[in-house]
Amino acid sequence: MLHIKFLKLKNHYVRIFMSVLFLAMFISNSAFCGQVITDEARQWAKQALAQEHTIQQTDGKKTIAVLNFENKTGMAELNPLQKGLAFMLITDLSTVRDLHVVERVKMQALMEEMGLGQSGLVESGDTPETGRLLGAKWIVGGDILALAQAPLYIHSSLLDVPDEQVLGQPTAEGILDNFFEIEKTLLFNIIDLLKVELTQEERIRLERPLSLNTKALLDLFKAIDASDEGNYEQAEQYYKSAIKKDAQLTAAEANLMELQSLDFASTRANESLQLLQAVRDQTSLTDTTVPGLTTKRNLIPEGNRIPITLDVPVPAL
């Protein structure tokens, strides 16, 4: 009995350590500079637009920007997936050593400065210029659809910014309850198109889901959106709700700790740790995905690349 209690206590502190480590990644890694759009990010966006005509495309650096996806299902309850899917892809792609990923807050600040509103949805004709402003070699975005044969169908386009060519249109489909599988399918399709060679360690790490709990993920996505709108108290509540639903969701923990570090949250850090302890003592989740993910690909041969319009054919609704 004493041994079991010791293991529980040990696991508790290990999880707290992992949460702090995840927050440190947000600070140290350029793609993890936090999820709060700061005055510095908005100032950068203003300067980028002011220098729009003088910005030169950087060569040689494998930089990718992930745009918000557009919900075209007609179901407003799926709107959190617009930023949520982009957040998940950015989180995963940022762990690939051969890639540099544009920070989500930088992308969001630029979208708002361009007058695209909180949704940050980019028209197809503006995509190449957006990529140049973000200093990206590649840019990916797309639509969230609902089809007869697939409750959720993700149709995206990967653009080579300097050449203004579509490299391919990776897709993924599934049900909302298995949204983590949909994101992983899309992720590996994008990586294949980029012709990035993954190490075995990277592949194993990328296969781990952010969360198996879709309700927790939706709360995380709602929190990010509320934070973008400057509604930090609501964001705090959504982060707490996400943590209660999935005590292993370190992204929600890190984002909540960021709000606290910036004095945007009403909850103190020690109160948050008490919350984590309470839910983790009652929670046990796996960190592996369900085997047998279905991969959907629609690759375009290098010699047959099409000019960029991003108005690519989409299966009939």
Kindly label every feature range from the protein language model.
Residues 17-29:
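Bacterial N-terminal signal peptides
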Residues 34-60, 183-222, 229, 248-307, ...:
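Pro/Ala/Gly-rich low-complexity, hydrophilic intrinsically disordered segments
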Residues 38, 53-127, 139-148, 167-168, ...:
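Short beta-strand->alpha-helix linker/helix-N-cap micro-motif
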Residues 43-51, 108-113, 117-217:
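Catalytic-center loop of serine/cysteine hydrolases
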